[in-house]
Amino acid sequence: MSSLSDLINFNLSDSTEKIIAEYIWVGGSGIDIRSKARTLPGPVSDPAKLPKWNYDGSSTNQAPGKDSEVILYPQAIFKDPFRRGNNILVICDVYTPAGEPLPTNKRYNAAKIFSHPDVAAEVPWYGIEQEYTLLQKDINWPLGWPIGGYPGKQGPYYCGIGADKAYGRDIVDAHYKACLFAGINISGINGEVMPGQWEFQVGPSVGISAGDEIWAARYILERITEIAGVVVSFDPKPIPGDWNGAGAHANFSTKSMRENGGYEVIKKAIEKLGLRHKEHIAAYGEGNERRLTGKHETADINVFSWGVANRGSSIRVGRDTEKDGKGYFEDRRPASNMDPYVVTSMIAETTILWKKP
C-alpha cells in the first residue's frame, strides 16, 4: 500500500510539463456531480483556453442513447487539492452539439442574469451556508448514531466539541483546507444542531462565482467522503421527527444595500421577495416541504415572513444591519440540495430586475 500511496501523492511537475484537468459537471438529477480527467500539454489558468470536451449523456440521464453526445464548456478553474502541482479542477456547464444548453444547465440562465447591466452595476454579493449530513455507508444512517437507534436529543451538538458530540470533524477540516488550497472563497465551518450534520460557508462571492464555488466545494466534499468511506447527503430532511433539517441559507447584498440608506433598499427587496414567494419556493430545492415546517428554526413553507434576528422567518435581517442602516439580509428558505446558480440568480432577478405589478 505504501507504493500506492507514493503514486497517489506523486508530484508530476518534477518530471513533466503536462497537467491533469478534472472536468466537473452536474448530472441529470440536478444534484449529482460527475467528472472525468484529461491530460493537457501545460498549465492553464484561463477557462477560455481550455478545450471543450464531450461525454455519454445517455449514462447520466441527459441524452438519449441514439444521440448521446453532450458537450462540456469549461467555465471556471480551481487548483486540484488531490493531485496538487499545476493540476486543476474545471467547472463546466453542458450543451447539445448544436450549442443549446441542456435543461440541467442552470448556469446558462444565471450567467445571463448576472451579465445584465443593472445587475452587474449592483455588484451582488453572496454568502452561502451549505449544510450537509454525513451518513454511515450502506445503512443510510447519520455518522455517530447507534445503528437502529438515536443519540441524545438536540442541544449539545451545535458547534459542539468532543467524541460524544462531534462526528466526522476530520472530514470537515480536510474539506476546509482543501477548499482553501483550491482557491474557493470558503469562509468558515461549524457543527450543526443535529449530530452528524455540518455546515461550510462560501463567500462573500460576486455574481456567478458563488455558484461555481459551491459546486466546486461540493465536488471536493464528495471526493473526501469517498476517501473516508462515508456518504454525504444534501437531503433537506434526512431524518424525520424532532431533528433539524439541512438548508443552504443565502446571504445577499447589493452595492445600494451596502451604502448609507441601504436598509430602505433591503426592505423594498424583501417586499419583492414576498410577492414572488411561491416562485422562489418552487425553485429552492426538492423536498423542501419536509424541512420548512415552522419548526426547527424554519418558517412555514406557505407563509412568507421576515424579521430582525428571527431564525424562524423566511428572511432574516441581522441586528448590525438594522443598527448601521445598511448591510445584507439572509434568505433562509433554500434547501441544502438547491442549485446555487438558480438561487443566486433568482434573488438578483427578483430584487434588482423584477418590477412590481
Swiss-Prot record:
Keywords: ATP-binding, Cytoplasm, Ligase, Nitrogen fixation, Nucleotide-binding. It is found in: Cytoplasm. It is an enzyme of class 6 (ligase). GO terms for molecular function: ATP binding; glutamine synthetase activity. SUPFAM superfamilies: Glutamine synthetase, N-terminal domain (SSF54368), Glutamine synthetase/guanido kinase (SSF55931). Residues 19-99 form the GS beta-grasp domain. Its EC number is 6.3.1.2. Residues 106-357 form the GS catalytic domain. Disulfide bonds: none annotated. It catalyses: L-glutamate + NH4(+) + ATP = L-glutamine + ADP + phosphate + H(+). Its main location: cytoplasm. GO terms for cellular component: cytoplasm. The keyword 4Fe-4S does not apply. Belongs to the glutamine synthetase family. Homooctamer. This is Glutamine synthetase root isozyme A. The gene is GS3A.
